[in-house]
Structures are given as structure tokens and as C-alpha cells.
A protein has these predicted regions:
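Glycine/serine-rich phosphate-binding loop and adjoining beta1-alpha1 elements at the start
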Residues: 2, 38-100, 229-230, 236
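Residues at the starts of beta-strands that form the adenosine-phosphate
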Residues: 4, 27-29, 33-35, 51, ...
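Glycine-rich adenosine-cofactor-binding loop
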Residues: 5-16, 21, 99-120
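Residues in the short beta-alpha loop(s) of Rossmann-like NAD(P)-binding domains
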Residues: 11, 131-133, 189-191
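A short, well-structured beta->alpha microelement
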Residues: 20-36, 42-45, 148
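NAD(P)-binding Rossmann-fold cofactor-contacting core
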Residues: 24-32, 122-142
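Rossmann-like adenosine-cofactor binding region
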Residues: 42-49, 139-215
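Rossmann-fold NAD(P)-binding glycine/threonine-rich loop
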Residues: 56-73, 188-235
Length: 238
């Protein structure tokens, strides 16, 4: 028997997800009629009584509901989509190629790791800023250079591309004063964000945020990742 599913989301990945579900016999319906609500985050009014919900956005699902952010395979997929989208955004905004460029990646979480791997594969010289002493050996062994977060001001000097991933302010005015004028600085973090954009503007630096890259850069693959996670979680039958 087909599961009645409501898809609630504002970017194109949810339109693709609705089409994928329809192709499998799960015709999308309104939330009030649904057995399962798939959403980017819990709706403001809460989930209607008796409904199941799968959340795949930055806020966790309510207790007792399926949270895609607890699916490690999904999170790794999203990290690579985000990293590839961020590199695409950087290439579109830069007048130089990635190969042989001096690049700074801030953070060594899933997105930071994916970014570093992809940038190295393109021939970039990558420095990774991390708070974790234990991560430095892992960073160095893949061919990147590890620097402590406390040394951010020194690390940003001369970098053509800068990617900030952790949701903590690292690139404040004091650090940004050391950035090159031709730098492209991309904030990939969720709130409270990692770059002081107001300070960057005051210093005539080009810095901006790139939220929701999977839904904008590769929405069809992002939708397939959600569908696969729903299956792994037993929310949908194979």
C-alpha cells in the first residue's frame, strides 16, 4: 500500500523529491492527509497529532520522529554536495583557476574534509584551520597543511580562496584585516555563521554566504539522498 506523503520545502530538492516519490507510487498530498511529512525543519505549529515526520534541515525532528541529520551516510552525501557547490561558486566568482591556488579551509568537520579532498584533487594548495590537535596528522597525511585556529590571522594571509564551515565566528575584523584584497571568502556555516560580513564590506573584501547549496547546486541528487535516507531509516519500504 502506498504511503501518503506530504513534501514541505522551499528549494528545488523538494520538488525533485516529490517527483521521485510520485514515480514510486507515493503521490504527494497535503499535510492534513499525509501519513508522513517530509520537511526541511519542523513546521512552526508542530506536527499534527498522529502524523510521522522526517526532517532533513538544520533543526532536529521532534522526539519520536525520524531525523535525517542522524543518518551519517546522508550527512556525508550532503557534505560532498555542499563542497562541490561551494567550489563552483568560488570558480564563478574568481578570475583565477583552482589549480595551484593558495586556499584556506576553516573547520575539519564533514564539509571541511570534503572541501579539502576536492580542492586537493583540483591541484590547490590547501591550508586547514582546526581547533582539534588530533586532526592535524590526518590533515597533513592527505597533503594539506594544518594550522591552529588561534593562528587564523597568519593563515589567511595571501589566500586566494577561503571557505568557512563551522557555525562559530572565526573571521572577525581582526582576522579579516590580514586577508588579501583579491580573496574570495565564502561562508558555508549555519547561524551564528563564521564570517563577519559587515567587517568584510568595510575592508572592501569580497565575502558572502552560500546557504542550502545541495538544494540549489544539485537538487536532483539532493532529493535522491533524502529518498535513500528515508529507506535506510525504515520510513519507506524498498
Amino acid at each position: 500500500m502506498a504511503v501518503l506523503i506530504a513534501v514541505m520545502g522551499s528549494d528545488r530538492r523538494y520538488a525533485f523529491l516529490a517527483e521521485l516519490l510520485r514515480a514510486e507510487g507515493h503521490a504527494p498530498v497535503e499535510p492534513a492527509e499525509a501519513d508522513l511529512i517530509v520537511t526541511s525543519s519542523p513546521p512552526p505549529g508542530g506536527v499534527p497529532a498522529g502524523k510521522r515526520m522526517a526532517a532533513c534541515g538544520p533543526r532536529s525532528a521532534p522526539e519520536g520522529h525520524f531525523d535525517l541529520l542522524k543518518d551519517e551516510e546522508y550527512l556525508v552525501d550532503v557534505a560532498y554536495m555542499t563542497a562541490e557547490g561551494a567550489i563552483s561558486a568560488a570558480m564563478n566568482a574568481s578570475e583565477a583557476m583552482i589549480a595551484d591556488s593558495d586556499t584556506l579551509v576553516i573547520g575539519w568537520g564533514r564539509i571541511g574534509k570534503a572541501l579539502t579532498e576536492l580542492l586537493l584533487s583540483l591541484g590547490a594548495h590547501v591550508t586547514v584551520l582546526t581547533r582539534r590537535l588530533s586532526a592535524r596528522g590526518e590533515i597533513e597525511v592527505i597533503g594539506a597543511h594544518a594550522v591552529a585556529t588561534d593562528d587564523a590571522a597568519e593563515a589567511i594571509e595571501g589566500k586566494r580562496l577561503v571557505f568557512s564551515t563551522p557555525p562559530a565566528l572565526v573571521l572577525d575584523e581582526a582576522v579579516l584585516r590580514h586577508a588579501a584584497q583579491n580573496a574570495r571568502i565564502i561562508d558555508l556555516a549555519s547561524p551564528p555563521y563564521g564570517v563577519d560580513l559587515e567587517a568584510a564590506r568595510a575592508l572592501s573584501l569580497r565575502a558572502w554566504r552560500e546557504p542550502g547549496l545541495p538544494g540549489r547546486y544539485c537538487p536532483e541528487d539532493a532529493a535522491r539522498a533524502i529518498l535513500a535516507a528515508l529507506r535506510r531509516g525504515g520510513v519507506l519500504d524498498d
